[in-house]
C-alpha cells in the first residue's frame, strides 16, 4: 500500500522541491511511527519539508496516519464537535487566546473538543495555562471524552493521545525551527471534530492547511492568520481567512473595525510570564478583563460560532460572545469542567 521509495529517494525528491504524493506521505509517517528513520534522516526530512513548504496532500495524508494509530477507549460522542487548536509558534507572546475562545464558545452552546499541548516555543501553551488553573489532565481518557457529553467541553492533552511522537520531541527542540509537526498538531485531534477554527503563524500556511482540512472531510472550518503575524484573529488590522465549506476554499479578510470597534496593537495582548497569562485568562472568562483582551477573544469566538453553525453572521456571533463573557458564563463553564475532571 505504501511507497517503495527509500528514505534517501524521498529526501532527494524533497530537496529538489518535489511534492510528495498521498502514498509517499503516508509511508514517511509510518516510518517515523515504526522507528524506520534515523535522527539524522529525521532532521533532514523536517528541514527539507520546511524549506519546500508542506502541501495539503502531505499534511492530510500524514495526519490520517497519525489518527489511524490513535485508538479511543470509548465511542466518540455523537455530537457536532468543534476544535480551536492552532499551530502556535507565532512568537508574539500573547496570552492564550484560543483557550479562552474555547470556553467562551462552549458557554454559547458549541460542543468543544479542544486539542492542545504545552508550549513548544516562547508562547504559553493551552495545557500550561489549564494546569496552572487547576485542570486535571491526568484523569482517565474515558472521563476526558465523556466530559463533552456531560459539560459540553473537554481538553485532549496531545502527548497522552499521541505517545508515538514523544520520541521526536527532543530532536524537534534541538532543531529549534517550526516543522511539519507544528502544522500536523491541529489536524490530529483524536475525536476528529466536525468543524474547526485553526490559527496559523504564517500566511503561507493558509492554503495548505485549508486544503488539508478539506481533504480530511471537515464540515466547516476557518483558517486564520492575524494582522501582525498572530496565529489568531487580531485587533490590529486586516486578518486573512480561508473559509472551508461545501467542498471549497474561500479566501476573505476581516477587521475589528468591521464590528464597529477600534483597532488595537498586538502589544496590548502580550504577557510577561505564566502568572500574567493565568490572570488574564481568568479575568476574560469571568468578564472582568481588559477591553482589548475581551474583544480579541470575542472576535475569535465569533469565528467558532460560525463554523459551529450557531451564528452565520459574524457580527451577531461577536455580540453573542460579548454577552456571554460579560455574564461570566465562560468561567462557570471552566469550573464545571474542572470539578468534573477532578471527581473520582
Curated annotation (Swiss-Prot):
One of its GO terms (biological process) is L-tryptophan biosynthetic process. The keyword Metal-binding applies. Binds 2 magnesium ions per monomer. Anthranilate 2 binds at residue 172. Its cofactor is Mg(2+). Mg(2+) 2 binds at residues 231-232. It comes from the Bacteria. Anthranilate 1 binds at residues 86, 117. Belongs to the anthranilate phosphoribosyltransferase family. This is Anthranilate phosphoribosyltransferase. It comes from Prochlorococcus marinus (strain MIT 9215). The gene is trpD.
